[in-house]
Amino acid sequence: MLDPYLLRHDIKIVAKKLASKNFLLAVDKVNQQEALRKQLQIKKEHLQFIRKSKSRIVNLAKANGENITILCQEINQINEQLKQTKSELSSLKQLINDYMLLLPNIPADDVPYGSDKKDNIEIKRWGEPRKYNFPIKDHVNLGYITGNIDFTAGVKLAGTRFVVIRGQIARLYRALSQFMLDLHTQQHGYEEYYLPYLVNRTSLYGTGHLPKFYEDLFHIQSINKENISNIYTLIPTAEVPLINLLRDKIFDENILPLKMTANTPCFRAEAGSYGRDTHGLIRMHQFDKVEMVQAIKPEHSMIALEEMTKHAEKVLQLLNLHYRKVLLCTGDTGFASSKTYDLEVWLPSQNIYCEVSSCSNTSDFQTRRVLARYRNKKDKQLRFLHTINGSGLAIGRTLIAILENYQLADGRIEVPKSLRSYMQGLTILG
């Protein structure tokens, strides 16, 4: 959620920045609602002042034995007016808040202007694409050759965009998550969490996934009569429960930054993505991801974004996978993000780069929603934390990259050296 101060004092600047994210701010509506809010606030305070003054007069008159009937009638009238004014003010504040929840975060000043992904800026490349002296197979064919990736079984069990992975590829899949968690906890300073895969609506509002992305989520309601009012949602990312661990808390500055990581399944309905990335494992309804989150002081958040992106890059480097780092333009930057880097790994079968990590600085956008603050040591004032989140990495897409980049001519797969200790020394799959 944006700082209300910005809308009250710099609304033209805010409107311009939001327009760069393809969001049209209703400036007149915001100004009109703010003017009415001020009027109702002043009216409420005025009525409270009059009531207080009248109450003093009543007390004095009562002490002197005077008739207070008319005075009491006047106070009752004031109470009715005050009740009505409070109700109008409360309803207006709810309307303002509902609209505020629809506003995306403001892009940082150094984010390049652009309308969509074609305007993103490539920052760097690491490594070189491998060269092969045989026809390249994609991960779907490689999975078919090994017999370890079964899309037909996924459709049978659940439907399209589901898969069954077994045997050696399943071991490799598990090894990837263990490798990533060990790297982030042992070398990068993150604390590992086990989290609920179902969350409540409050948690999703806290991260900005609601109300905007309602149709992209899987919602669950119990048929048990005792729990029928409880509506849960399958997490789209571990970012949701991790960020909400900060909710309604005040942290000591001395313990910052907080660095958290978790490996969870993620569930996305992918509404509106029909026809996009439908090949194989690239865009599934259910996938696994190692997530990183940092909660940090505002003045350190951009440095933390660079650090977290390097943590994600380290995974790709240790796996010796060619990738590029991309700075997203304003129009492609996510709803809650002020600045985002994508890491895209090379897929030789399609001659394309595929996103395996997205690292974002959400500034105080999420912490304002969840009321996550810290106490400044110098002035003892409460301030909103900044949060950084990033994939470290998406397991399924990283698996795709390994299968395709480490394939041999006969369809077998070489195990990356950094994963062999997690595979009991196995060097070749198939």
From Swiss-Prot:
Its EC number is 6.1.1.11. ATP binds at residues 268-270, 355-358. It is an enzyme of class 6 (ligase). GO terms for cellular component: cytoplasm. InterPro entries: aa-tRNA-synt_IIb, aa-tRNA-synth_II, aa-tRNA-synth_II/BPL/LPL, Ser-tRNA-ligase_type_1, Ser-tRNA-synth_1_N, SerRS_1_N_sf, SerRS_core, tRNA-bd_arm. Pathway: Aminoacyl-tRNA biosynthesis; selenocysteinyl-tRNA(Sec) biosynthesis; L-seryl-tRNA(Sec) from L-serine and tRNA(Sec): step 1/1. The keyword Nucleus does not apply. It is found in: Cytoplasm. Keywords: Aminoacyl-tRNA synthetase, ATP-binding, Cytoplasm, Ligase, Nucleotide-binding, Protein biosynthesis. GO terms for molecular function: ATP binding; serine-tRNA ligase activity. It catalyses: tRNA(Ser) + L-serine + ATP = L-seryl-tRNA(Ser) + AMP + diphosphate + H(+); tRNA(Sec) + L-serine + ATP = L-seryl-tRNA(Sec) + AMP + diphosphate + H(+). Pfam families: Seryl_tRNA_N (PF02403), tRNA-synt_2b (PF00587). L-serine binds at residues 237-239, 291, 391. CDD domains: SerRS_core. One of its GO terms (biological process) is seryl-tRNA aminoacylation. The keyword Protein biosynthesis applies. Its main location: cytoplasm. Homodimer. The tRNA molecule binds across the dimer. Belongs to the class-II aminoacyl-tRNA synthetase family. Type-1 seryl-tRNA synthetase subfamily. Consists of two distinct domains, a catalytic core and a N-terminal extension that is involved in tRNA binding. Catalyzes the attachment of serine to tRNA(Ser). Is also able to aminoacylate tRNA(Sec) with serine, to form the misacylated tRNA L-seryl-tRNA(Sec), which will be further converted into selenocysteinyl-tRNA(Sec). This is Serine--tRNA ligase. It comes from Baumannia cicadellinicola subsp. Homalodisca coagulata.
